[in-house]
Amino acid sequence: MIIKVCGMREPENIRAIEQAGADWMGFIFFPQSARYVSHRPEYLPEQCHRIGVFVNESSENILLKAQEFGLHHIQLHGRETPEQCRKLKATGLGVIKVFSIAQESDLQSAGCYEGVCDYFLFDTACSGYGGSGKPFNWNILQAYRGKT
């Protein structure tokens, strides 16, 4: 199991989460998010993997943020194509692709990303991007047949 805490911005929170033993820490680079990180915090975790969360961002901007923040993985919440994911992965970044799930048929959208991404994140379907804090019916995942 991997424990990831997302939406980190404040140095004291970053230190506390790192000391609590989180494996991964997420930084949101989506300007419409209340937890958007507009600049590099005074402190970045040294013991947690740093994850950059992006929505419909250009590969160029993703790579700039990856370098600035020393990201290990990128988490993609938008309409990123398998080809964009493949090219980003080729740079050495781990790629996490997010899929919104409301019903079993939503799992099919992951198929063309199989073998391209390192991880899939299945999230509750909602009107916006990112987590809603609400669980979906996890029994739906029993129908998932992918390997990622």
Enumerate the predicted regions with their spans.
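Conserved N-terminal beta1-alpha1 strand-loop-helix module at the mouth
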Residues: 1-148
